[in-house]
């Protein structure tokens, strides 16, 4: 299995090995809620969203532009998730007056953004990736495994104790790295090598 045939998988492995090597030397405080690791995750997600918007501006095929715009919104949804954006905007008294708990604001914002992202992906017919086998099996399996690790770490299962938060944050970071690698490499190859412009397709409203 050469690196040239599976660049995403090897990039994934390199990121995992790097994080595993550095973890014992990093303070546990960096993994706390809203700590340094979460800021690193937000920075990575923001860069991923910007890279998708860059791809959006570089493509001419209308359906492809929808897909890149939709993926940018997907990454931004995770930015909102990591930052708890819009949660606790109002004082408790104001929230009671509106009859809605503060924490619902963040979920409402993420829901609206997710619906917009899904709409873009549907308009761009993102399932074309599956037909052309652009989505690699091995990186996706590794990605799903990391999501399982994140679930275990978040709940502190198997007596992990304080190491649970370390496992959770490292797994989340690798999930985001994997998502970016999978989309940017395979999406770029597929979406720039094929013309899918149809006369009746609409172009997204962004310039």
Indicate where each model-derived feature is located:
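Short, hydrophobic transmembrane alpha-helix segments
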Residues: 23-36, 54-61
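N-terminal membrane topogenic signal
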Residues: 1-13
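C-terminal transmembrane-bundle signature of multipass membrane proteins
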Residues: 148-158, 167-204
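Short aromatic-rich membrane-water interface segments that cap or initiate transmembrane helices
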Residues: 31-39, 95-109, 165-173
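Hydrophobic cores of alpha-helical transmembrane segments in multi-pass inner/ER membrane proteins
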Residues: 11-15, 41-54, 106-122, 172-190
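Membrane-proximal helix-loop-helix units in multi-pass membrane proteins
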Residues: 78-131
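Juxtamembrane "helix-exit" motif on the non-cytosolic side of transmembrane helices
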Residues: 20-30, 84-94, 122-126, 151-161
């Amino acid at each position: 299995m050469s690196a040239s045939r599976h660049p995403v998988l090897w990039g994934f492995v390199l990121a995992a090995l790097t994080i595993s090597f550095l973890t014992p030397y990093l303070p546990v405080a960096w993994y706390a809620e809203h700590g340094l690791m979460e800021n690193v995750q937000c920075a990575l997600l923001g860069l991923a969203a910007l890279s998708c918007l860059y791809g959006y501006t570089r493509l001419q095929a209308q359906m492809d532009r929808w897909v890149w715009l939709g993926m940018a919104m997907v990454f931004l949804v995770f930015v909102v998730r990591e930052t708890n954006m819009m949660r606790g905007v109002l004082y408790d008294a104001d929230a009671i007056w509106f009859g809605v708990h503060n924490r619902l604001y963040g979920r409402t914002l993420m829901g609206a953004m997710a619906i917009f992202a899904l709409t873009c992906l549907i308009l761009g017919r993102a399932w074309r990736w599956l037909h052309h086998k652009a989505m690699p099996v091995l990186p996706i399996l590794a990605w799903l495994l990391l999501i399982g690790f994140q679930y275990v770490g978040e709940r502190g299962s198997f007596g992990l104790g304080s190491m649970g938060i370390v496992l959770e944050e490292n797994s989340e970071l690798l999930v985001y790295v994997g998502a970016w690698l999978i989309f940017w490499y395979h999406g770029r190859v597929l979406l720039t090598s094929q013309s899918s412009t149809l006369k009746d397709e609409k172009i997204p409203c962004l310039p």
